[in-house]
Amino acid sequence: MGKLMAPKILVTNDDGVYSTGLKAAFDSVSDLGEVTISAPAVQQSGVGRSISIFEPLRITKTNAGGIPAYSVGGTPTDAVILGIFTILKEMPDLVLSGFNIGENISTDTITTSGTIGGALEAASYGVPAIAASMQVLDEGQKFDDPRDYHRERFEAGIKVVNRVAQNVLNYGMPENVDLLNINIPYHAEEDTPIEITRLARKIFKTDVEERRDPRGRPYYWIAGDLIREEEEGTDVHAIMQKGHVSITPISLDSTARIEFSEIEKYL
């Protein structure tokens, strides 16, 4: 009787190949199979599922916190595409994107997060995908580049993702689910409750800040405060108001669930 093959797991992120969150992602699945890291060379937060089609991409072998990794000069989606079609040359059994430094909750982040974008790219090929993100209390932490890895900071999230990933490998995704979006609250412990949630509508109160350069010409920063209060059952409510782990099942099919006759009256 032949030896069973270890599951192939591809790990990526959007904070860059040297982010401590990527090391946490590796640690969360390292005992579950053969893990390959293919991640952006530099910070790619906010690029969503964007893909590089007007410039060539390069892959560099590197060492990410003591782990062999592939650094891709592109977006998280590029890293997933090259990870599957150039590095692995086959479909993995699971793609894990994360751990993002900063929560990815609400419909705002589903369409803008590079962490989720990379996971969605994998899901588009029928590969089970997980996106994992850690809440920060200071929004400025999202823009830091910490490389000193302290596993205890991620321990609760590592255990949650390990358990979920093991079950996804064992049983596959539920019907009509392409991606599990996992968010870990900042103060999570091993016994922190876990909620299955739906997406809140918004997480940002979008604003634009105008400033002036030394020549008096205007330039702009897109900014905005966080929305911290939302309906019970949403990911924002679970993370921001209750401090619970949030797991949101996501589908690639964005078709509105309405009777099509409702649209025909506009024709």
Curated annotation (Swiss-Prot):
Gene Ontology annotations for the cellular component aspect, listed alphabetically: cytoplasm
Cofactor: a divalent metal cation
Major location (coarse): cytoplasm
EC number of this enzyme: 3.1.3.5
InterPro entries: SurE, SurE-like_Pase/nucleotidase, SurE-like_sf
The record's free-text note on cofactor binding: Binds 1 divalent metal cation per subunit.
Keywords per UniProt: Cytoplasm, Hydrolase, Metal-binding, Nucleotide-binding
Keyword Lipid biosynthesis: no
First-level EC class: hydrolase
Residues that bind a divalent metal cation: D14, D15, S45, N100
One of the record's GO molecular function terms: 5'-nucleotidase activity
Alphabetized SUPFAM superfamilies for the sequence: SurE-like
UniProt keyword Nucleotide-binding present: yes
HAMAP family per record: SurE
Record's function text: Nucleotidase that shows phosphatase activity on nucleoside 5'-monophosphates.
Family, per entry: Belongs to the SurE nucleotidase family.
NCBIfam families: PRK00346.2-1 (NF001491), surE (TIGR00087)
Protein name as annotated: 5'-nucleotidase SurE
Record lineage: Archaea, Methanobacteriati, Methanobacteriota, Stenosarchaea group, Methanomicrobia
